[in-house]
Amino acid sequence: IVAGHHPIYAYTPKEESERMDMQKRIDPLLRKYKVDMYICGHIHNFQHIRVPESDIDYIVNSSASLARKVKPIEGTKFCSPEPGFSICSINKKELNLRMIDKKGNVLYTITRKK
């Protein structure tokens, strides 16, 4: 699992060059070292993206204080503009990341097994 601030793949009205630079410089390292999940924030919405030819789950976590509009892009498994937070639980065999809205409702769960 790798955590960062800026997204590598995500819908955002911000400059595309920011993501393109991450795709060029960081994504090859994540693939080389067989990272399972890249988790970030920065754009204040929930997104789960799985790009073609990659086994990496790209996760964007929302913010409890501010939420921004979102729409699906290629590889989107889930997206939501709801404000909230995520909880991650891990054991020897499984990782569960739950995206939770400000009322405490689980909006989406990502599960990775080893």
What positions do the PLM features span?
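His/acidic metal-ligating clusters that form di-metal
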Residues: 1-59, 86, 106-109
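Binuclear metal-dependent phosphoesterase catalytic core
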Residues: 47, 51-114
